[in-house]
Each structure stands twice: as C-alpha cells, then as structure tokens.
Amino acid sequence: MTMEPRVLRREEWDSWYGSLIRAFGGVPEPAEELELFRELTRVDRSIGVWERDGEAEACVGTTGSFDFRMTVPGGAQVRAAGVTMVSVAATHRRRGVLTSMMRRQLDDVRAWGEPLAVLTASEPAIYGRFGYGAATFSLSAEIDTSRVRLSVPAGTDDVRLRYAAPADVLDACEAVYARLVPGRPGMLARRPGWERLALLDPESGRDGASPLQCVVARRGGEVTGFARFRVRPAWGPEGAGGTVVLDDLAGLDPATEAALWRFLYDVDLTSRLAVRGRPVDEAWQYQVSDIRRCRPESRDALYVRLVDVGAALAARTYQAPVDVVFEVEDAFCPWNAGRWRLSGDAKGASCERTSDGADLALSVRELGAAYLGGVRLSSLGAAGRVREVRAGALAEASVGFGSDVAPWLPHGF
C-alpha cells in the first residue's frame, strides 16, 4: 500500500469532502452549505492524501487553501493563503499524513508568491510545529440585558433602523463590510461568493432560535451599518426571558454601532444577548453599566504563518521607528531561517537578509503571533519565547509591531 499526497481533481471532490466530514464527526452538512463550499473550494489549491491498495484508492487526508487578501497594520491588503479543511482519517494517525500535506501546501504557497498562510485551528496544539502562531483573539459575552444599561455617544439618535430581509440587503451590507476591511488588521477582503455565507440559515443550526433576521442602519440617507441575529424565545414563571443571538454586526461610525447595540438590548420579550467572535477592543464594553453581568471571555482565533519573512515584514508598517536584526529559526521552511534586518516606521518598511549580528532571536511562530499587532513581542519575551541579544531591542520592536486597533478575524473559513 502507498500513500500519495496530490492536488485534488474535481471528480474526487465528493470522496475528499466526505473524508473531511467523517473526521469532524460525520454529521452531514445541510445541502445548501455543502453546495456553497463545493463552489468556493479551489480544487487547484486543495490536496488529498490517497492510499492505494491494489486498484482501490481511499482518501485519508485533506487540506486546502483559499486565496485571500488580508489587512495588515498600515492598511495594506496582503496575499494570504487561507488554510482550511484539514483532516486526517482516524485510521491513519501518526503516520506522517498531516506533515506531508503541510509540507506540500507551504511549498505551494511559497511558489504562488503568497507571503502569509493563515488558519483557524480546531486543535491549536497541532499547528505550532508548522510555524503558526496565535495572532488574533475574539470576544464572546452573555449579556444580561435586563440589568445592564448602555451609555451611547452623541449622534446615536440620528441613526434610523429598519428591518429587512437578509437577502434583500445583502449587497448593501457587503458594501459596509468592504469599507471596514482596510481599517482593521486581520480582516479579509472577500471574493465574490463569500458574502453568501452570511445567508446560510439551516434550521438544524438555529438551536431553537428564529430564522435569521436583519436590521439595517441609515444615517443621512446612507446605509451605515447592519446587524444580523436570531431570537430564541423562552418563557418561565416570571414571563418572557428570550435570548438575542448575534450573528454579525458592523457600523461605519460610533453612533451607528451604538444604535445597533442599543436595539439588540431592547428586543421585546428578551433578557439576554449572546455575542460570539467580536473584536476584543469593541467599544460596547466601555458603554455598559456593569461589565461583570456581560461575562466577557476571550479566545484564540486566527493563526498566522510567515511563508516569506522578508516580504511579510516589509508589507506592513510600524507604529514607531524600528531597526532590528532578527535571528529567525524556521526548521519547517528553512528558506526563512537566518538573520533579517527590519527597518521601518509608519510610512513603510524594508526587510532584507543581513550578516550583521542579531538583536533578537525567535522562531517564525513568534513572528506570526506578533505580526498583526495583537500580541506584544515583549509578552512573548517574558514567556521565554523571544531572546533579547541587544539591550533595548525587545522594547523597540514591541512598540513598533503594535497596532492601535486590535486585529480581528470576522468569520471563519
């Protein structure tokens, strides 16, 4: 028997995707979702590991990637491979299947000239050895809207809200999203077709809640924001106690955002607002009367891997002037290993090979974690994951790598 990693062929998609679904528990996806991902999957960027036994073949490993552009500090949108659909059959664990796929995939990403690879991890412990570092975090909350009050900024009352069928206002909502992308690191410039993810609404995924609802915000005649949500009714001895389940919210200005949040707090017959996957620096946290009754929690979200260290570090800007030499360790992508001089500021940067002595020593995993500005190099240094060679270099680089806006991945892939 032989195992062969190779690029997926269109006629193999059903077998390949079936292997993926089985690895994630085997629960069939709703037909609408299945067909959308069939359309979105880039077959030429997808890999399967196939075991051949005589004339028979079976798929025992899957991975793929989407060709994204991701915002980085400074506002540039950098090419990034969105790694997805990673699985290994339970019958073939610890046989090198995952390593062979990651090897082929990162070689391909390099050949395509994409300086970054990014992913969301079902099991975070897996991906560090391949050079991925946790670069963004997301905020969840369970807000007791019967007890928590919201203090809103000036102009909030000028915002007009209207219900709309989600499909009818999809283009307007997508236009709002597109305007927000350059302003926050980690956001993805969506290709055509991706906006349809927001409309997926199978009954099996509602957990007792209503079909998807949408409210659109207008200010001065312009659509300035939207909220997509569901309502899960509940009744007890004291009356109604339903939950608003937020799916997505976006606003072009603070007043629009506040108006949308205030609306969600005030939905009739509800006393709770469930929030998932929001930016960790979102303003509502500082507008509430009692943050403890919001039960905020943070968790890891996007993992970043620098495939081309020089191109990736030169593609972003830096909050403060930085001139440091990194000694980079990268056993899995050895073309990155060695010394790199990064010189940059708020206007731009360069990153080139150098023979000069190192100022900081770290692995490519730490560079990935710090890349979007959400994880401080100084924190990684305190954890023993960055070694300072030149005194003061760690503080200099840590300040430079920072971002005023927390990086955020708005949706999975």
From Swiss-Prot:
Example GO BP: aminoglycoside antibiotic catabolic process
Coiled-coil ranges per UniProt: none
Catalytic site: 127, 413
Single GO MF descriptor: aminoglycoside N-acetyltransferase activity
Enzyme class of the recorded protein, top EC level: transferase
EC number(s) reported in the record: 2.3.1.-
Binding site for acetyl-CoA: 86-88, 94-99, 122-123
Membership in a protein family: Belongs to the acetyltransferase Eis family.
Self-association and partners: Homohexamer; trimer of dimers.
Annotated protein name in UniProt: Uncharacterized N-acetyltransferase SCO2625
